[in-house]
């Protein structure tokens, strides 16, 4: 379902859910929205919040120092390079006058990182990068698989970069409609 979304307010609300948890661990929680990102969008805030909440919870869980940051920018690649987006998504069912922005959300941390050998299974159910992390950090191993399903349902793509001991960056890009300009009453 497409719902009007004020991006800065939405981001602030999501981060507020994790402020206390980050503070208890001595982590700085930071966000930045690039200037060229439209702030009045239409999308599925429930699914967006579920994905961001899982990524932020993981970033805080697996970090003992530093900063957890949420960055929002536009995917500037030309359309032919965005082939990972499904050909049928809610964005394509709208009228030709609807403007779509490919908005990329990135969650970065200074946590334990992920070994390259674990990437192939990272978004599969019941998988954590290392069995010992399940014992130390807990969790079901379902979070990233659910994130992938939700991002897929929104017509997007999710991925990650990481290096053991150097933290991780999880990114997902989804097509979001720009809200139509509201008519101003004549003076």
Residue ranges and their predicted role:
Residues 1-6, 23, 28-39, 75:
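Conserved catalytic submotifs in the C-terminal HATPase_c
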Residues 132, 155-161:
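Glycine-rich ATP-binding loops of the HATPase_c
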